[in-house]
Amino acid sequence: MKFTNGYWLNREEYDVNSPKETYDAQQNGKTITAFAPYTRIMSRGDQLNLGTTTITLTSPVENVIGVKLEHFDTNEHGPEFKINNLDPEVAIEVNDQVASLQSGDLKVTLPLRTDFEMKFTANGQLVTQSETKPQATIWNHDTKVNYMREQLSMGIDEKIYGLGERFTNFVKNGQVVDTWNQDGGTGSEQAYKNIPFYISSNGYGVFVDESQRVSFEIGSENVDRVQFSTEGQSLQYYVIYGPTPKEVLHRYTQLTGAIKLPPAWSFGLWLTTSFTTDYSEETVLKFIDGMQEHHIPLDVFHFDCFWQKGFEWCTLEWDKEQFPDPEGLLKKIHDRGIKVCVWLNPYIAQKSPLFKEAKDKGYLLTRENGDIWQWDLWQAGNGFVDFTNPAAVKWYQDKLKVLLDMGVDSFKTDFGERIPAEDVKFFDGSNPQQEHNYYTLQYNRAVYEVIQQEKGADEAVLFARSQRLVHNPIQYTGAATISRSTAQCVIQLRGGLSFLLSGFGFWSHDIGGFEDGPGTPTADLYKRWSQFGLLSSHSRYHGSDVYRVPWNFDDEAVENTRKYVNKLSLMPYIYTEAAHAAAAYGNPLMRPMFLEFGDDDNVYDNATQYMFGSKILVAPIFNDQGKAHFYLPSGKWTSILDGKVYQAPRTGEWVNEVFDELDLPVLVRQNSIIVRNEKAVDAAYDYTKDVDIHLYQIQDGNVSSKVVDEHGQDTAEIKVERANGRIVINTVGLTGDSTVYVHENNDTIKLSLVDGKAEVTL
């Protein structure tokens, strides 16, 4: 949101007041409260007839400094995010010249009785700063609305990322971003998952702790600053110092909540009915059995909207005309070793039998005059469940318990973005502008909690479309994806990478695209999209009016899917990375290149490839000629598919190569241990039994890798030492017969473990 007319002038409708100095400051325990008037105070008379901003400085997590800017001390109506306070040690100095607070390496300094500035430094180096004009309280005298604004400096060549699942350019510099959840598809500037957090290439991040709309101008109003503003009389934000991007994300998730580890089975293949297709018990079993007949392992089957009767979403009851015996059907699916997911949304159509019940009990949002808030968008006479009402939450959860007891394992929590923010009342009196974004958190939490209660914490998982802050185990995108264009794959990927830089660990999308058209997707596109989707953290075939089973395209599509579903063989590596990097440390499983190679300037703009965990590089091919253009940081890289070795020089290297239709670059970085089980037919199995240990281009020194079990607990460890051309392998915790494969240059040496040990001289 822009307030200025060029650099010199403010827009006519705005009155802008900025702190001109920090007049004084006080320490209260581990907090500093400073007072910043809107003019320099040269005499006692200057203290009259002017406003001040109260600046409160805190540190809830080491290397994180919280800043609250407050003009008027107004009542807060909520809702508000829950922020963790780990109560770190801080160093505070307050005297007649300066006020400063230091947490870990990060320090904020406010000089007193001189031109206003607020500097954030680490180890004596500037991180970012707010100066005399950027910070402001702004009054729109036309609309009678007040705003609070902050502007933090950007360095030369500094790049900004994150802000949720955004499908615009990966680097956000020059963009205007409003964090307001909307159902805008994946081809617009709107986003389902708006997260008011950005991460900088300069080793820090900023989280704006406001649930309502926050407007970001990333070098787009003042070109050397990131500006963020919101309605109201106060603004809370946190500066988070790394110095590495991984450490920034770790501290951010310490602040806002840890990433939860999804159950192992969720990492397998999900297949859906698609949306408006015809589906019945016969159709469902035909597709499930078809996957088995084509030797394609399937872990989850998803029923989309029409498991319920049309015009009645949601009834949370099966359409008995299509599914006369749902319990029997779920048992048949479970007997085939497959989990079940069903679709739901937080709305209740007027035709639904639940509508009157919810209306009579006061469980739906109302207008200011007491009428139910309804519209005809999506379902006729849609009402909205009021998740601020504890009784409504329990009522909704009780309906879901029936389904869980019946055999449903998971839910796809669709929608939750188009929540009214005008002429609406919430049960708990929440501010509608704040509730618009916060609603999806309450909706997802209600569903997630009931799964935890019924299935256990280790089995709880959601496929959630919209989001604000809470760390549900899976997020997905895909609505309104245009499947005709290979460019949509790139758009999906950069949206996913932006989202995964916003504090989330796992992500998926609709393989093949959701929106259909004549002749789409082509078999070529389907195969390339399948490779990308099956090498994502979570993998789901889904569409609108076309079934996404591979045999509907061609025989090669079946072969391609079968090949890349073999991601299951990598589950010892994948689940260990998920448990250690994501759940324990706050880093995503799929990650942009700069998270792993922060010292390489060539990777900071790259959003067409990614690291799958810390050791495997994936470069999807987004054209029908098989042309790959990918970047390799310095070192040796080995193809996990055919063993080809690439040697990238010290400065890194761009590679142009043509791959056949069933191949793409999937490369392991040097000095890596990858544990696999080629016999895997499910995602959840014993990751320590009868495994293959692949050692890729081991360098002199020591390297080790832990292996978790299917519950995410450390169970085994592999240690490797190389010296004088000799490699020694020691393992603890493995069972059965395991084999070691030493990949040395272009050769592969096979070894057997004896008493958990092996060695070879090269």
Swiss-Prot record:
Protein location: Cell membrane
Main subcellular localisation: membrane
Consequences of knocking out this gene: XylP-xylQ double mutant retains the ability to ferment xylose but is impaired in its ability to ferment isoprimeverose.
Highest taxon of the lineage: Bacteria
Signal peptide per UniProt: none
Record keywords: Carbohydrate metabolism, Cell membrane, Glycosidase, Hydrolase, Membrane
Pfam families xref list: Gal_mutarotas_2, Glyco_hydro_31_2nd, Glyco_hydro_31_3rd
GO cellular component, one term: cytoplasmic side of plasma membrane
Keyword Iron tagged: no
GO molecular function: alpha-D-xyloside xylohydrolase; carbohydrate binding
Entry-linked InterPro entries: Alpha-glycosidase_related, Gal_mutarotase_sf_dom, Glyco_hydro_31_C, Glyco_hydro_31_N_dom, Glyco_hydro_31_TIM, Glyco_hydro_b, Glycoside_hydrolase_SF
Listed EC numbers: 3.2.1.177
SUPFAM superfamilies associated with the record: (Trans)glycosidases (SSF51445), Galactose mutarotase-like (SSF74650), Glycosyl hydrolase domain (SSF51011), Putative glucosidase YicI, C-terminal domain (SSF117125)
Any Gene Ontology biological process: carbohydrate metabolic process
Induction: Expression is negatively regulated by XylR and is subject to CcpA-dependent catabolite repression.
Catalytic activity entry: Hydrolysis of terminal, non-reducing alpha-D-xylose residues with release of alpha-D-xylose
Topology in membrane: Peripheral membrane protein
Enzyme superclass (EC): hydrolase
Active site: D414, E417
Record's function text: Involved in the metabolism of isoprimeverose. Hydrolyzes isoprimeverose into equimolar amounts of glucose and xylose. In vitro, can also use p-nitrophenyl-alpha-D-xylopyranoside (alpha-p-NPX).
Family classification: Belongs to the glycosyl hydrolase 31 family.
Name of the protein in its database record: Alpha-xylosidase XylQ
